[in-house]
Curated annotation (Swiss-Prot):
The lineage of its organism: Bacteria, Pseudomonadati, Pseudomonadota, Betaproteobacteria, Burkholderiales. It comes from the Bacteria. SUPFAM superfamilies: Actin-like ATPase domain, Heat shock protein 70kD (HSP70), C-terminal subdomain, Heat shock protein 70kD (HSP70), peptide-binding domain. Residues 608-631 have a biased composition (Low complexity). The keyword Cell membrane does not apply. The gene is dnaK. It comes from Herminiimonas arsenicoxydans. PANTHER family: HEAT SHOCK PROTEIN 70KDA (PTHR19375). This is Chaperone protein DnaK. The modification Phosphothreonine is found at residue 200. The keyword Transcription does not apply. Induction: By stress conditions e.g. heat shock.
Amino acid sequence: MGKIIGIDLGTTNSCVAIMEGGKPKVIENSEGARTTPSVIAYQEDGEILVGAPAKRQAVTNPKNTLYAVKRLIGRKFDEKEVQKDIGMMPYQIVKADNGDAWISVRDKKLAPPQISAETLRKMKKTAEDYLGEEVTEAVITVPAYFNDAQRQATKDAGRIAGLDVKRIINEPTAAALAFGLDKTGKGDRKIAVYDLGGGTFDISIIEIADVDGEMQFEVLSTNGDTFLGGEDFDQRVIDYIIDEFKKINGLDLSKDAIALQRIKASAERAKIELSSSQQTEINEPYIAMANGAPVHLTMKITRAKLESLVEELISKTLAPLSIAIKDAGVKVSDIDDIILVGGMTRMPKVQEKVKEFFGKEPRKDVNPDEAVAVGAAIQGSVLSGDRKDLLLLDVTPLSLGIETLGGVMTKMIQKNTTIPTKFSQVFSTADDNQPAVTIKVFQGEREMAVGNKALGEFNLEGIPPSARGTPQIEVTFDIDANGILHVGAKDKATGKENKITIKANSGLTEEEIQKMVQDAEANAEEDKRLKEVAEAHNHGDALVHSTRKSLTEYGDKLEAGEKEKIEAAIKDLEEALKGSDKAAIDEKSAALSAAAQKLGEKMYADMQAQQAAGAAAGDAHAAGADGQADAKAQHDDVVDADFKEVKDK
């Protein structure tokens, strides 16, 4: 069995990790970074860029550069959160035939799982490059507060990327695994995982216990907001910059897609810099034109100003904290450790608010960008059987139920129920001689079904005619370990039953997923072909360059016919290099190599002659040196004698 990799599919950044020698390892991507921007760009020539290369060209290609797509995954176009995003994003969010929110790029409609699959494919390739083998299985994380439709859509994205998703696990739970892995022997402890990422916020209360030598991670409660994160913080800064610029220059930059993209990049940079400094400067020259002259954007932003802009957003995270503590049945003072996850938790004001709430400092020994991927890799090692001393008990974040008479939401499974779980309840008909019942499934906490998220519906038909309230219809809810719901209904009198795996009454059909998988495979083939063409081009270019250089140096040693043959072969190869036919380039490269063989022989002969001449010169030099040595030796034989002059007497 191959490795099961762990992937944190983030709103802003993604990360991949594996277990190696019993220890988790975060893998660097092809750019040498440990995290990859969740940005996908669709180029005019059909090429798809993912990560840093996509982010770099966003300013010049704003309408076809997609980011924060996770905020749309598993959502309907008409949801208020999606409508809010439409006004914020430079790309076009459209309504799909099934009512889902999709994105229009270069005259094509793309589903969010299809786009997210590009990021997952990059993560898969990153792991494969490191391991040197194919990877087909993964554990992918999602925000704890993701509903059934969002979880199913994430699983679909994995399938489109060519991955068998062995488990979908909650991000705070994954972070707890990463934190608790090396905390054995420290006794039972309750931890709070505060996860404020690029697009979502989660809080989970988790108990880590040692049960008969096995580490047990039990989620006691979870809460959050799937539409609150760093993107919203960025938007506050963007709005402030646009307003200030308008006051000073009278120009509205919000309608200029390219200017908006530059401001977004500046706002994100400023937000990050203000986590470590008190003041930063935004400097975007030539942001607009006024009266034929360029206008520059220069502005200072202080940490205090940033904090005042986002104070309300930080405060919005506090209500879920209180609910999670209450639902877990614990007191704030019972929490032993607070773990911060997600890039936004680097903001000093966020840390300060968390400290105020819990009355203690959050821990700083967990990497907020990598902990989730590490936890996913740990869970992968549990699923593969490599690790047997760890048990994870997660929960369903929202209540699940069906619509009953009067539009009431009858809850079958309460929120924060440990999963996997199964629950059955008997219902009956509302009318006399009713031949069928429609089971409408909802997820949420409102008392009336209409106020909750509709997950799907199905019919149970063929109920024998009888008075209302007589038939016994048993409805069963079954949630698997991924948090995905399966619902069945059975007429106890006839034994007739109907079952479905809840796929949001929108969602992608099996046919759509298969088509997207095929498209992705075709893209992979095309990418491989383009790479091979590029390599052939590079080889051809290098061959032309080196042959030309050699021809300049040694061409005069060739016969006229040989030289002409090489020059003709160079010309043919240069012509082939203007196109993208790999076979033609390879053929002309081979022809040039063959034609240049004589040139190579002349070069080799010349080099040998030079070496021989060098050796002869060396011998002559050595002989001269020997003569000098002999002469010196002869002189060395002479004995210097002392003499005394004798004078005549």
